[in-house]
Amino acid sequence: MREHSHGANYVSSVHWAAVLDSISELIDQCQEKEKEKKPVPEDGSIAPQIPGPRLLYEPVKETKAEILASMPARTVVDRMVARYFNALGIAPAILHSAQFLREYESFWKDPDATPFVWIGLLFSVICLAVQFQQPGEEAAEWSSLMRIRQFHDRIVQCLVLGQYTRGGPYVVETMVNYCASELCITKDTDVGPWLPLGIMVPLAVSRGYHRDPAGFPNISPFAGEMRRRVATPPNHATSSTPTSTRTPPTYHPHGPRPKSPLSSTPSPRTESTKSAAPSRDLAADAHDRPYPEILALDKDLQTIETSLPPIFRWQPLSQSFMVPGQVLMFRLWLRLAVLRLVIWLHRKYLAPAYSAAPYAYSRAACARAALEIAEFQLLLHEETRPGGQLHQMRWMQSSLMQSTFLLGMSVACYWMQLTRTALPGADQDMEMRERIRDRLRDTYPLWLRCSAVSRDAREAAERLRQLPDLQGLLPDVEGQLSAQESPGSGVPACWDIFHGTGRHARALDAVLGDMDRSRKTNADWARV
């Protein structure tokens, strides 16, 4: 449990915040600084411009005529639809382009006859397309953010007026797009943007998406394939929720599909019947597992990664010039997922209680994974900037990816503190210590850049400032940054929803330019 101004929050043992709390040297210092901070407002937001989930808070007073009147001109919507299907890569997995185009034409012929939910689906397509536009294509970034909020309102209004809780065609598809939009906007690992998933999953189950359509002869092969594609995002999202929200998983792959009865006899089971507990996710398992089992799982993980199709295996960018940015981002996602699982498997054996030689492999595995995560964070920052190989794919960054970077940073800090104090003389790979120290130093400007719009980034920057290994190595940019900003500009006047690029970030770029150039020169990018 972690104490905050709003009370206590629960974090699972594999969450980055739990790892940070294990660093004894930083706990007292950060607690003192937490007391000195001003109380957080009731809504808990840093930037008041960042809304909560509109589906949970938005009252609906508009009529269908008012909603349709707010629809952009068809020429504009045509461009947004084209961008959605051509740029996302993920969107066509839940919407069939030819089928959507037919319904799209029918909408423009008679908008009043179109169901509310389909209108909401169209607004969700427009909303995501606006989020993924390139800076400079349209008006200022701030006006883009305002339009996104307006489209969020329309999506919610259409869902409510269409009585989405009763299910129906395109309800789940609209919810998938809506949740994706919310998660792309959020900067922190707050629970709020994930709450709509708690609505989406039961809706998907009520529509039978948790069952394979092959067993239902009345569902055509085409409809069955589309149902499988629509069912994938809710399943993946619910498995990702614990990573981003600090909570144990509440949805397991064993739950949706019922198993066969244990007995074919008509006698019912009673309260006295004893049966084995269902299997549990290892990350949420409260019981100790034998160390040989952990090593076996680690080997299985390596085997699975090796068995991936070549197109999805991570290769250095120097060997990937001809690979589309979307594929590169998928490769990066998969590699980060593997590194996160490595930490989940071995994080427990970083503790001083496991200082014996047999556990050295786990300590080294965590250190290597944390170092590689930090290198990926730096790589992603460089390549999503204008001119980078991943600039067109920068929209694919989200709070889920940031939580992986936070986990890597936390484990790296813990490993540095552990090998310096709790395990003196053990694991003293000085080259590894220097590499991790340098990467933590290099990522500090990135956390500081996002600290104006992200509580998690602000905490990460604060923890790095307090890390003994980095004392005297971090540039003093706070005073220079405040000198370049006008009074009262703690919240940037405009910020890129993907990078947080407003006055705060531009001033930080000016202050840290030399440091960035030095990092580009010294970093071993060939390894990444």
From Swiss-Prot:
Cellular location(s): Nucleus
InterPro entries the record matches: Sec_Metabolite_Reg
- CDD domains linked: fungal_TF_MHR
Q: Name the source's superkingdom.
A: Eukaryota
Whether Signal counts among this entry's keywords is no
Give the UniProt entry's GO cellular component terms.
Answer: nucleus
* Biased composition regions of type Polar residues, renumbered to the chain: 261-276
Region spans: Disordered: 232-283
Chief place where the protein resides: nucleus
- Alphabetized GO MF terms: DNA binding; metal ion binding
Keywords in alphabetical order: DNA-binding, Metal-binding, Nucleus, Transcription, Transcription regulation, Zinc
Biased segments, Low complexity type? 238-249
Record carries keyword Transmembrane? no
Which cysteines pair up through disulfides? They are none
PANTHER family per UniProt: UNCHARACTERIZED TRANSCRIPTIONAL REGULATORY PROTEIN (PTHR31001), ZN(II)2CYS6 TRANSCRIPTION FACTOR (EUROFUNG) (PTHR31001:SF74)
Q: What's the stated role of this polypeptide?
A: Transcription factor that regulates the expression of the gene cluster that mediates the biosynthesis of the tetramic acid Sch210972, a potential anti-HIV fungal natural product that contains a decalin core.
Name assigned to this protein: Transcription factor cghF
Give the organism the record lists: Chaetomium globosum (strain ATCC 6205 / CBS 148.51 / DSM 1962 / NBRC 6347 / NRRL 1970)
| This protein's encoding gene | cghF
